[in-house]
């Protein structure tokens, strides 16, 4: 049992690393998706000349961006350059979009050039640094590109074909709705970005390149299950949960920040049944309508889903979202109405969260003894950190930034991903399930755990403390 918290943290870290290669490049993916939806022969405005952008973007641009980002995550720009060059080997050596290959070669290139520098730099004489740095990177990049072209590329192609065939078998057997049994609980455990951008998106993009769309883009991004739970809290919830549910529903459905409904599930874990049932019914509807998207919608907003929907196929996408919402709402309403408890404090919710995760909560002690944690004496920078650094943390930072401004304090409030936490931050605010990872990344800062980024009493407590 003692090893499980570290194992969960490792899974989250690995998933965050995979999604970290995709998330910074989402704008490029959306650009490709829009060009595809607009200008291919079945698009809104078919244009043979502009449609020529589709192939090169998915074959070269997107994999190279992933490879560069993966290398940069390991060893800054130098790692990114070698990672991109290494990625070119798998791109040219394959006849399918090489996203999985890019996610391998990019970090590998960054890791190897980092090790090469560690060996060579202490031995380089003064005046030869630029020569050695440039040629060591160039030689290694050339070797990796050749190895990727001849060896790694064919292996990744075979692996991708096996994955694609497996997905086709699952879809053909009508088993795809069962994926929600795994996806929905994993989302609540903050693996949503890892699932969507690390697993489903690479396979889905391969499908979209050949078939023009992929249903895999809809599995994790469907806002229906979470919306149903939030609507149930709006009608049958109690206390703070009911008061905050309307705002959370708007942010979730329109803004696409799915993390906003996770605390509601963690407060009453039996609601996981509602989102699983909603997810399964939504996927079943997508299968019935043969629905799919041309590219990954990010964030998972209803507007992003509609923007990535092929022309003439809105009915299937909307039907899947609506049915998922209704099913999730009905089941969540039954659970809330039949629940004896009227409210839960944070300690009780944490204990129930242990049952949902099947392990002792690694943050329970931190939650109970939060007041005993060392506090920063001089505060100049406060960082909100989440898994991707773009969704829930941005929302929390905006709320606290407004409070700090109204209090007349000259303190920087920003947001980032846990993997990108700077060293000069004074206070780090994270969701309680991610605090351990943040402490491991930056153990010297003051860490504050919150249960809900949208509404936490700790914001006012912190502002009052900083004013005094």
From Swiss-Prot:
Keyword entries, A-Z: Cell membrane, Kinase, Membrane, Phosphoprotein, Phosphotransferase system, Sugar transport, Transferase, Transmembrane, Transmembrane helix, Transport
Known catalytic reactions: D-mannitol(out) + N(pros)-phospho-L-histidyl-[protein] = D-mannitol 1-phosphate(in) + L-histidyl-[protein]
Domain called PTS EIIB type-2: residue spans: 380-468
Extracellular side: 48-51, 158-166, 295-314
One Gene Ontology CC term in the entry: plasma membrane
Cytoplasmic side: 1-25, 73-135, 188-274, 337-468
Single GO biological process annotation from the record: phosphoenolpyruvate-dependent sugar phosphotransferase system
Modified residues (Phosphocysteine): 386
Subcellular location: Cell membrane
Listed transmembrane segments: 26-47, 52-72, 136-157, 167-187, 275-294, 315-336
EC number(s) on file: 2.7.1.197
PROSITE patterns given in the database record: PTS_EIIB_TYPE_2 (PS51099), PTS_EIIC_TYPE_2 (PS51104)
Domain PTS EIIC type-2: 14-344
Membrane topology qualifier: Multi-pass membrane protein
Active site (catalytic residues): 386
Primary localisation category: membrane
Domain statement: The EIIC type-2 domain forms the PTS system translocation channel and contains the specific substrate-binding site. The PTS EIIB type-2 domain is phosphorylated by phospho-EIIA on a cysteinyl residue. Then, it transfers the phosphoryl group to the sugar substrate concomitantly with the sugar uptake processed by the PTS EIIC type-2 domain.
Function: The phosphoenolpyruvate-dependent sugar phosphotransferase system (sugar PTS), a major carbohydrate active transport system, catalyzes the phosphorylation of incoming sugar substrates concomitantly with their translocation across the cell membrane. The enzyme II CmtAB PTS system is involved in D-mannitol transport.
Subunit details: Homodimer.
Name used for this protein in its record: PTS system mannitol-specific EIICB component
Organism: Halalkalibacterium halodurans (strain ATCC BAA-125 / DSM 18197 / FERM 7344 / JCM 9153 / C-125) (Bacillus halodurans)
């Amino acid at each position: 049992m003692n090893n499980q918290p570290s194992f969960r943290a490792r899974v989250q870290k690995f998933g965050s690393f995979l999604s970290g290669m995709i998330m910074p490049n989402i704008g490029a993916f959306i650009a490709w998706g829009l060009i595809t939806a607009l200008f291919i022969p079945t698009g809104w405005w078919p244009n043979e000349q502009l449609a020529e952008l589709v192939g090169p973007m998915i074959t070269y641009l997107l994999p190279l961006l992933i490879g560069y980002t993966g290398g940069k995550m390991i060893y800054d720009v130098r790692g990114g350059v070698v990672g991109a060059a290494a990625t070119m080997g798998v791109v040219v050596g394959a006849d399918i979009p090489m996203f999985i290959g890019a996610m391998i070669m990019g970090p590998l290139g960054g890791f190897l050039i980092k090790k090469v520098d560690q060996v060579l730099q202490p031995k380089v004489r003064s005046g030869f640094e630029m020569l050695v740095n440039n040629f060591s990177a160039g030689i290694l990049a050339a070797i990796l590109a050749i190895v990727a072209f001849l060896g790694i590329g064919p292996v990744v192609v075979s692996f991708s074909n096996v994955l694609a065939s497996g997905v086709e078998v699952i879809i053909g057997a009508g088993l795809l709705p069962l994926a929600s049994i795994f996806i929905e609980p994993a989302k609540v455990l903050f693996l949503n970005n890892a699932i969507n951008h690390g697993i489903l998106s690479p396979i889905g993009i391969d499908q979209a390149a050949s078939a023009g769309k992929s249903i895999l883009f809809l599995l994790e991004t469907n806002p229906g299950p979470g919306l149903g739970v939030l609507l149930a809290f709006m009608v049958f919830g109690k206390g703070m949960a009911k008061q905050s549910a309307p705002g959370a529903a708007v942010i979730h459905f329109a803004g696409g920040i799915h993390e906003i409904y996770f605390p509601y599930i963690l407060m009453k874990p039996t609601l996981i049944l509602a989102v699983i049932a909603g997810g399964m019914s939504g996927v079943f509807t997508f299968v019935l309508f043969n629905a799919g998207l041309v590219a990954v919608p990010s964030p998972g907003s209803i507007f992003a889903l509609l923007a990535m929907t092929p022309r003439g196929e809105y009915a299937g996408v909307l039907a899947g979202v609506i049915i998922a919402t209704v099913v999730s709402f009905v089941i969540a309403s039954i659970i809330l109405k039949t629940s004896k408890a009227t409210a839960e404090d944070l300690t009780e919710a944490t204990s129930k969260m242990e049952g949902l995760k099947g392990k002792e909560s690694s943050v329970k002690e931190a939650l109970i003894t939060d007041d005993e944690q060392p506090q920063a004496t001089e505060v100049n920078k406060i960082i909100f950190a989440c898994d991707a650094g773009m969704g829930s943390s941005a929302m929390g930072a905006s709320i606290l930034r407004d409070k700090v401004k109204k209090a007349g304090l000259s303190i920087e409030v920003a947001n980032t991903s846990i993997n990108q936490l700077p060293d000069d931050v004074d206070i780090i605010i994270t969701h309680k399930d991610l605090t351990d990872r943040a402490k491991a990344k930056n153990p010297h800062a003051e860490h504050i755990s919150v249960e809900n980024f949208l509404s936490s009493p700790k914001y006012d407590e912190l502002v009052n403390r900083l004013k005094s």
